[in-house]
Amino acid sequence: MERNVILAKNAGFCFGVKRAVDEAIKYQKEFGKKIYTLGPLIHNNDVVNYLEDNNIFAIELSDADSLKKGDVVLIRSHGVKESVIKDLTDKGLIVKNATCPYVTNIQLKVKKCYEQGYKIIIVGDKNHPEVIGINGWCNDSAIITNGKTELENIPAKVCVVSQTTEKKETWNKVLNEIVRASKEIVAFNTICSATDVRQKSVQELSKEADLVFVIGGKNSSNTTKLYEICKKECPKSYHIENVKELDESLLEDESVKTIGITAGASTPDWIINEVISKIKEL
């Protein structure tokens, strides 16, 4: 049956993620030995396996104690607390920083405003490594909200930033709450421009598609948010990690004429292309 398969604009690797993967490969070749990343370099199991094949391994911060002087540690795109970089360097480790420049920008804004006496509010997931890292640039003192419950006791002088992959509607909701309660507000909409474009693109795509596949790691924040946006517009939206999770029975529905494909910022082109090729085969 003839079907229309549409790939969303800006699907797949974002600038920061591609840069981190490229840096990891570059340093492995440069040093000619194992490279350690603090946590998975990106939230995609297929890419993590690819990196391991290239002698690049994820470790937890606690594992750094067992590393030897001269071992190479790469800070991933999500970034880390300011103190972590100092601690690793003090251990005699070679520290290479692949923090996404957009995240670095947030970290520096937070540090400056915190030093100027502003209470920091971060709109995002308190358990996400990016948010944990940002909080470390204001002495772990930030108020962190995901917008699901109203903020209480909002200080009079605040600086507001966002996780780069946050939904714009959540940012706007929280900011409106703060505007009603605070007298002095410095607000930086730090949602990554690529995230914003990606979210708008999938919203439009899911309006015209009968079926949507959102490709990306199940532990990927931005992929999950894309899936949530798609599900609102197209009930037949499914989050899959790769072609192995493609449920072929979904394609047997003859009412499905247009299939939308999008992918998170941690999903490489080859995984996207495998899914598209499989759909076209069926």
Swiss-Prot record:
Binds 1 [4Fe-4S] cluster per subunit. Gene3D superfamilies: 3.40.50.11270, 4-hydroxy-3-methylbut-2-enyl diphosphate reductase, catalytic domain. Signal peptide: none annotated. Disulfide bonds: none annotated. Dimethylallyl diphosphate binds at H43, H78, H128, S220, S221, N222, S266. [4Fe-4S] cluster binds at C14, C100, C192. Its EC number is 1.17.7.4. It catalyses: isopentenyl diphosphate + 2 oxidized [2Fe-2S]-[ferredoxin] + H2O = (2E)-4-hydroxy-3-methylbut-2-enyl diphosphate + 2 reduced [2Fe-2S]-[ferredoxin] + 2 H(+); dimethylallyl diphosphate + 2 oxidized [2Fe-2S]-[ferredoxin] + H2O = (2E)-4-hydroxy-3-methylbut-2-enyl diphosphate + 2 reduced [2Fe-2S]-[ferredoxin] + 2 H(+). HAMAP family: IspH. This is 4-hydroxy-3-methylbut-2-enyl diphosphate reductase. It comes from Clostridium perfringens (strain 13 / Type A).
